[in-house]
Each structure stands twice: as structure tokens, then as C-alpha cells.
């Protein structure tokens, strides 16, 4: 995220922002129980670095009751930031369907949307695109050699940013079909779509597959916490020694 974008959108006083948690409440509690900040907490911390005069509401769109309360009031928000999750969108659970449905409601009312990792996958799906399991591997802690496209280099989000950069990242899935009229902003060897920009409804959406809001310290904590899943379920890493070398 570049200085021009920060100055335009995050340093204005009294902005009303809605921050959405991508994980289920149960998953969020698992994070908190082991001392790892939730994705929403990481987002709020990052935002406070740029601007302490923001009015931030936090929502978990997995909960139907939350959605009924907030949908009539969405127009009050200047922007939406939607964070990461351990969910896979093709699993099509009720919690995932609620998130997609709520994103569609946001497209009717909120003009600026920053959708990060899972958030981008929800936004893309809600706008008619498609997300599948990644075919070129996964990111476990870091995305290396993210390259801006020409369109990315002239987009406000990346103005004056290095054309090649690394970022914290943790994902197993990827966007395979973008929404109509989407502009491809960045890629790397793992994910063709590392970031994109598109418009739908009243919204402008910037979608990122990587995690600019998460510190490497938190990523290391997540990797250690997820080691059993990474080894036995995801089968992305052979053993604990390999995890230690990876870190």
C-alpha cells in the first residue's frame, strides 16, 4: 500500500469504516486462546498506525443476527475492509454463503472496499468470479517476488511502490476467473492473481491475495500453531523439522 493511497483513504479524520472478520467466531476464539491476534485485530492495529481518528465497527458476517442488524445501516460507512480466514470458499457452508450474501449487500451501499486474501475471494465470488484450490502451490508465511502489471504500476494503490516486492501471505486457494471488467494488478509464480481492481454496484474494490496488515511475527506464530494441520491435513510440509527450517 503506497503513501498516496494512505493519504487519500486512511488519513482522513472521522472516517466510518466497517471491518469484517473472515473466520467463524469459533476459529477466532481458537486464535485468541493461544495468544494470536484475530485477523480483525491485526487490521485494526494496522489502521491505527496510519490514523487514530477512525470510527471502526467490527462485524462477523458468519452470524445471521449480525447481518440483520447492520444491512439497513450500511450507507453510513465510507469504506469496508474484509480480512482473512481459514475457510475454503468452495466448501459452500452456511457461514460462507452468509459472507458472500453480505458482500453483495455491501456492493449496493459502500463505495470503497479493500478485500484481503479470503476477503478478495469472497468479493470475487460475490461479483461472479471463481476461486479454486491453487495449482502452483501455496503461500505459507510469505509471498515472494510479487510483480506489478503495467496496470498495477499506474493504479493509485501501488503508485510509487517497487514493481517487485515480498509480503506476508498465507493461502492455499486462488482466483481463477475474475469478475467482468476486473483489472489485473499483480501476480507471482504461485498465484496469477495477486491483486486486482474492479467495480460493481456502487463499489470500487481493491483485492489482495497477500496480507499487508499481518506482521511476520504473527505469521511465524500462525505457522507454529498450524503445524499439525500443515503436516497431516494440508500435507504442505513433511514434518516439524521442515517447519522450523521454513521459519
In which residue ranges do the predicted regions lie?
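Cysteine-nucleophile active-site neighborhood
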Residues: 77, 85-151
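Hydrophobic/aromatic beta-strand patches that form the interior of the parallel beta-sheet core
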Residues: 18, 57-59, 81, 114, ...
